[in-house]
Amino acid sequence: MIPELIKENLFLEDGRALSIETGELARKANGSAVVRMGNTSLLATVVISKESKEDFKFIPLTIDYREKYSAGGKIPGGYIKREGRPYDEEILTMRLVDRLLRPLFKDNYYNEIQIMISLLSYDINVLPDGLAGLVASTAVSISEISFQGPVSTVRIIRINDAFIINPGIEEIKKSDFYLDLDLDLDLIVGGTNNYIILVEGEMREISEIEMMEAIVKAHKYIQLQIEAQISLITKNKKFIKKKLYKIELYNYYYKYINFNLNVFYIKEKIKFISYEEIDYIYKSCLFKQKRSNKIYNILKKIKFHFYNESIVINNLEIDIIFDEIKKEIIKNILFKENIRLDGRSLDDIRNICSQVDCLPGVHGSAIFTRGETQALSTVTLGSSLDVNKIDNAIMRAKQRFYLHYNFPPFSTGEIKLLKGVSRREIGHGNLAQRALKNIIPTTYTIRVVSDVLESNGSSSMATVCASTLALMDSGIIVKRPVSGISMGLIMNYLTGEAIILSDLLGDEDYIGDMDFKITGTEYGMTACQMDIKISGITYDVLSYTIFKAKKGLLFIIKKMLTTLSCPRKSLNITATKIYTFYIPKKLIGAVIGSGGKRIQEIQVSTETNIKIKEKNYLGVIEILGKNETKLKIAILKIKNITFVPKVGTIYKAKVKNIKKFGVFVKISKYLEGLLHIYEISWLTKVESFIRKGDIISVKYLGKNNKFRKIKLSHKMIFSRYYLNKNLK
């Protein structure tokens, strides 16, 4: 059967074209689509299982995103020449697409859904992650699955106050090398035609108004892409009425319930047994662990009750109904009494305490505790040898700052099998890293590790606060302290009411409809990530949340500064000191010496580590050492080697040898020249007034290109009368 290509085109303001295609590739999938922009091409497929999975409490959705090395014209490095496990950038894109699509599936979907996105071709002028949401939405929209889409994403950056949609890696890189290019925003926005679903990115202390301006700008392009998807769907002659791949929860109950009892009876029965007790527990302002234990005991009692009454209902069904009742009770307390589970009002921040220098053996450390969430961050300083090298299908780069986030199971009082770094840990670590990367200097390679020791919500934001304090404790001169806060949205679906919560608890996140993580300094935002469970939020809700977060951020910063008001004046005594300076490229060989002997001698004698590299026609010298005195000696030695005299400048020179035709003098340790007899004085005798070891003044006249020697003069410093009088 000959493939039938169906295609839709649209154009950006700058004239670039974007196309959406279906019908030609991957026809065995329930839905497939290709998006092309420039030479960047992405293929997305969606496959739905024929049988439902009845043991899930959530939508069994799996997103897989892979960037093939062939897309960028590369072969994988290493011994195995094929793509392996996904790298961090791929995992971050998987999480991004998941957050975009998951809210738009029905809650009672129990058929497995697998969406696979592949980068087939890569163009340096178009980054693929901004198109991943578009191609995935198109594939799902033309499949049989019931989906409240279409949706789309765009990447938007701002350089010199000008917005660019779906930029390339070169545009972002240029801002790092050219001072006149100021990239202060890099954002991915996702949404439906009327609402925003996804906001994620980093900023350089921009205002809340500028943030909303970028979101509104991006949403206009999202709407264009949604129109293109709708047009593509209507062109698809084979597009059939969507089938609802799901298992109706209530119908499922009927199969297991005797005596013609229905699910409403069961729900009312569970309410009768537990409602007042649960309500009392949630109003008692208990600690999370104690509250969870009491709730768990109630659940066990309910299961035991149904078992004794011989009502055939499985534990999963009880769990789902019990969760619904818990959510209903918590929402009632919030909306009717404006009191939260820990007794706070809607705007209150939990109690904060912090400490620094808690681990004396590391370069910098801090513990940040907010309520029942606690993070321990450590800072390790290194050199350019310790950079995090990124070499994947589309990018080759070096990170001088990187942050690793660990979320061990004991932080929530659980036992779990440790299987390496989870996707969640990678995502939270990346968010904290983006929050801090633009406020630290680039002299050092900096590795921050954050271990969550206790968690009851907002652990990634606690990581940002702890890491800021740890950086300040290490002596790194941060531009300004950064704090983080999680903002929540709770909707009442019956009345349409909505409330915004500051500093989310874990249970509030679980029952809520939005978790909006925002980080920033007193001057503006540095990073954000929005995760919602509903089909979108309006500009008004988004704007109100962002402006409300500012108040919380400033409060947290004020609390942090009571622990450490400014960065330490010097690096920790255990930290390696680094000194970086530039030399002319042609003098690199002089520093290294014959066979590397000179640089090795300096390193051994001063107990330092010296790294030399070329950059922009200069030699970059990086000297590392723990002893400040020896480090200064190494610096002095290299500066002596690379000493370049200035024409017309007078220097003190030491006489090394005397000849009839002049004297050999040294104006630095490694720079020697001949002071000819005719340049010594207006007299003809030398020995009568100059001896070996004398220190005399000489004027540097430049180089003798013929003999490749330096030219020096003594007599040009003074007048003839002065010399005759003083040198006789």
UniProtKB/Swiss-Prot annotation:
Catalytic reaction annotation: RNA(n+1) + phosphate = RNA(n) + a ribonucleoside 5'-diphosphate
Annotated compartments: Cytoplasm
Domain S1 motif: 648-715
Group of enzyme by EC: transferase
Coiled-coil zones: none
Recorded superkingdom: Bacteria
Residues that, per the record, bind Mg(2+): D509, D515
InterPro entries the record matches: ExoRNase_PH_dom1, ExoRNase_PH_dom2, ExoRNase_PH_dom2_sf, KH_dom, KH_dom_type_1, KH_dom_type_1_sf, NA-bd_OB-fold, PNPase
Family matches, as CDD domains: KH-I_PNPase (cd02393), RNase_PH_PNPase_2 (cd11364)
Main subcellular location of this protein, as a coarse class: cytoplasm
Domain annotation KH: ranges: 576-638
Keyword terms: Cytoplasm, Magnesium, Metal-binding, Nucleotidyltransferase, RNA-binding, Transferase
The keyword Zinc-finger is assigned to this record: no
GO biological process entries: mRNA catabolic process; RNA processing
EC number annotated for this UniProt entry: 2.7.7.8
Name listed for the protein in its UniProt record: Polyribonucleotide nucleotidyltransferase
